[in-house]
Amino acid sequence: GNYRTEMWSQNSNFFKENPLFVNKGISVQTPPQMLERFYDDVVLEGSNTVIILAGINDIAQNTGPISINQIANNIFQMSKIASDNNIEVFICSVLPANKILWNKKIKPTYKVIKLNQILKIYCLKNNIKYIDYYSSMVDWSGGLKAPEYTSIWDLVHPNKLGYKKMEEVLMNEIKKEL
């Protein structure tokens, strides 16, 4: 994961209370950067399950322009590495965003929806679990609900209640698999 994932540990006790979950989020990383460290972080660490949450920093063009298909392909490559090593994969939807305050020229709403559609179809075709954070956290404008799940000065990163909602969605999906 990226900053959203990294900050989960700062805004919640979820990882302390669930020590089988390891947070590997690194601030501002994009899927290509995550892919570079994926084998070491997931396979060599001996994981039996991986939860992939990625894409918003590419949509924000943090490392330059990239197509939605390229973003998805990087996530698919991580999924394939895990599957090839008998690691169960969960792919998460990208959280809603209708503004990227650090790159105001980007209009993310449609791109988030499109990427989520591609990810969901991939999961269905490949028998991979899809964690749909988007549906539970989106507002009328296609953004992350503010002030419920993000601050009005951010609009991209979850607040404490946002992380609580993510935990609820995640644990409900995991319980379905048990």
Each predicted region: which residue ranges?
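Conserved SGNH/GDSL esterase-like catalytic core that processes O-acyl groups on lipids
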Residues: 1-77
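Sec-exported extracytoplasmic/periplasmic mature domains
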Residues: 39, 43, 55, 80-87, ...
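Catalytic His-Asp segment of secreted/periplasmic serine-dependent ester chemistry enzymes
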Residues: 95-178
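Active-site segments of SGNH/GDSL-like serine hydrolases
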Residues: 53-59, 79-113
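Structural recognition of the beta-strand scaffold that forms the well-ordered cores
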Residues: 21-25, 49-53, 89-93, 129-132, ...
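Short C-terminal domain-edge/linker segments immediately following a structured domain
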Residues: 27-33, 51-57, 81-85, 120-123, ...
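Short, functional N-terminal and low-complexity linear motifs
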Residues: 1-6, 44-47, 82, 86-89, ...
